[in-house]
Amino acid sequence: MNLRTIRAELQQFLQLAIPLAAAQVAQAAVGFVDTVMMGRLGPEPLAAGGLASALFQFILATASGVVMAVSPLVAEAQGAGKDYKIAAIARQGLWLSVLLGLPVMLIISQLARLMPVLGQSATTIALARDYWMAVLWGIIPGLGFAMLRGYVAALEQARIILPLVLFGTLVNGLGNYLLGYGQLGFPRLELTGLGLSSALGLWVMFLGLLAYTAWQPKLRRYPFWQDWRRLQPSICRQILQLGWAIAVTVAVEFGLFTIITILMGAIGVEALAAHQTVSQTIILIFMVPLGCSFAVTVRVGWWLGRQDGLGARRAGLVGVGAIALWMLLLAIPLALFPRAIVGIYVDLNNPVNAGLLNLALPMLRVASLALVLDGVQRVAMGALHGLQDTRIPLLLSLLAFWMVGVGSSAMLGFQLGWGSTGLWIGQSLGVAIAGGLFLQRFLKLTQNRTFKQRLQPQPLATHP
C-alpha cells in the first residue's frame, strides 16, 4: 500500500460511507425521538418503552441480518463483472423479507408472556405490550428496507437513503406528537401511539426506496421487477447460507446489550430508566460506525469479486482507521458534558429525577471510554462480511460478547455489587475483546495478494 492508493480508497469509502452513516443516524433518531417523548410521559413509560423498544430493535436487527447478505453478494457480482446476477439476488431478497417477516411478527406479539420470567414488574409488562402490539406492523417494511438499502449501496446509489430516512423520521415524529400526546383532536395513545408512528415511518421509508429502484436510471438497467413473482429456491439458499450466520452474529452482539437492559430492569425501574437515557445516546452515536460498516462491506466485497486480497485489506483498514478517529472525537464531549446529555431526556430540575441522574453519570463515563473500541469492532465485522466470512466471526462473537461481556457484567454488577455501572463496564470489556478478535481475523484472511480458494464465493445458480 502507498499513500496514493490509500487516498483513492479513502475517497471511495467516504463517498459511500457518508450517506449511509448519515442515514443510519437519521434512522436512529426515530428511537431517540421516541425516548425523549417517553421521558415526558413519566419514569414508568420511559422504563417500559425503553425495554420494549430495545427488544423490538434487537429482533428487527437480527432478522435483518439474513437479508443483509444481499449486499456482499451483489457487491461481489458487480466486482466480478457478472451484472446478470444482481437483479436476481435482490428479487429473492425481497421475497425473503416478506416470508421472514410473518413469523417475526408472531414472535413480537408474544413477548409479553416472557417478561415475568425475566423479573419485570407488572406495570412495565403492560406498558411494553402496548408498544409491541403497535410497532410489530413495521417488521416487514423494516426488513424490506434493510435489504433494499444493501442492494442500492452495493451498486453505489446510496444517496437516496438519507432523504428517505429523514422523511420517515419526520413522519414518525409527527405521529408521536399526534398519537402519543393526543394533539389536534387525535386520541392520546401514549406508548401505543409511539409504536404505531414508528411502524408508519418504516413503511414510508420502504415504499419510497422500492419506488426508487424502479425509477432511478442506473438501477433500471438491472431488471429488478422481471419475473418478480417467481421464487427461486437456489438463490434463496445462497442468501440464507450467508445470511443466517450474519443474523446470529447480530443477535449475539445486540443480545449482549439487550441482556444488559433486562438486567437493569431487575435492578430497578430507576436504573432501567437511567440506562435507557445512556444507551439511546450511544445507539445514536453507534449509527455512524454501523453505516460505515455497510460501506466497508461493499468495498471489501468488490475487491473480493476481483480476487484482490491486498485491495480488500486496504479497504478494510481504511474504514477501521477512519472510524477510530471519528469515535475518538465524539468521546470527548461525552466525557466532558454528561449532565447536559442526561438533561436532553429528563428535567434535571425535577427532584424525582435526582436518582436517575446519579445512576446515569457514571454509565456515560464508562461509555465514553468504550466508544473507539465499539466503532472498531463494528467496522471490522463489516469487513469480514465483505469477505463472506461469517461462521468463524460468529464463534468469535459468542466468545467476546457472551462469555466475556455477559459473564463479566453479571459478576461486576451483582456479585461484586457494582450495580448498573458494573453492567456497563462488563459490556465494554466484551466490545473491546470483539474488536481485537475481528481485526486479527480480517488481517489474517487478507495477508496474501490473492484470496485462498476457500474464500472464493460460490457461484449463484442463475443465468443471464
Swiss-Prot record:
- Please report the record's description of how this protein sits within the membrane: Multi-pass membrane protein
List localization entries.
Cell inner membrane
Question: Family, per the entry?
Answer: Belongs to the multi antimicrobial extrusion (MATE) (TC 2.A.66.1) family.
What cellular component terms from Gene Ontology apply here? plasma membrane
Entries under Pfam families matching the protein: MatE
Report the protein name in the record: Probable multidrug resistance protein NorM
Give the gene that encodes this protein: norM
> What job does this protein perform?
Multidrug efflux pump.
Q: Which GO terms describe its molecular function?
A: antiporter activity; xenobiotic transmembrane transporter activity
Q: Which GO terms describe its biological process?
A: monoatomic ion transport
Keywords for this protein: Antiport, Cell inner membrane, Cell membrane, Ion transport, Membrane, Transmembrane, Transmembrane helix, Transport
- What are the TM regions of this chain, as residue ranges? 13-32, 52-74, 94-116, 131-153, 160-182, 192-214, 244-266, 281-303, 315-337, 352-373, 394-416, 421-443
